[in-house]
């Protein structure tokens, strides 16, 4: 998992900075259209016509579903990578704040860049398109043929890091089911590769439906766990805030706050500062 994290540490920021830079260039070139685009976003989101037609509810539903694929907030997958990180200050709450920042950057910056790229496009027929083709067409209208190639390359890199990372997430949980052995890993790897093959061959609506169901179940289980662990979350957060307010060295100790259950590794937060 650490090797994957190191790989993503270089690839993901490069992709993100490149994508945001291109979006900024497109926005600056079309700066005169930006006010009308922002107005269109607001009126479309809160317009009475859309609300009356049920389009608002449909947009919220679709936004939540697709938003989870983007930032994975609340789904319980990213904490696997967060658990392998070395936070500074040396406290679980500080890593939690980092994860919150990641959701903000992904949603409010990267997704907003995509929205601007699409809405600033002036090509005809874009309203009938959806998904990656919509973004490719909009980028091509701004930058020519290289725009479509840029989006394809970015998607390939994002998809590759996602596939590799999610494999590691699943593999790290095998020990919870007492399957962290050669046979268990072999079955898991075979099943994972089989799902990738099926996903590449199945129709897009079926893939979306299957993914929506799986991600929904993940999120449901994780949210239930978060609710159950609320006392621990509050205690750990208060411990972090109190130490920061008192200008103490912020390190985590199980003795400083009450947590539910027991840590699987007692020294997990030692020697990481």
Residue ranges of predicted features:
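Membrane-interface alpha-helices at helix entry/exit sites of multi-pass transporters
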Residues: 87-105, 180-189
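Extracellular/periplasmic helix-exit of transmembrane alpha-helices
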Residues: 22-40, 48-50, 54, 83-89, ...
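Transmembrane helix-loop boundary segments of multi-pass membrane transporters
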Residues: 2-12, 97, 118-188, 204-221
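Select transmembrane alpha-helical segments in multipass membrane proteins
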Residues: 18, 49-68, 109-112, 117, ...
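Terminal cytosolic tails of multi-pass membrane transporters
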Residues: 223-273
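Hydrophobic alpha-helical transmembrane segments of multi-pass membrane proteins
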Residues: 8-11, 21, 25, 53, ...
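Transmembrane helix boundary and interhelical junction motifs in multipass membrane proteins
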Residues: 72-81, 88
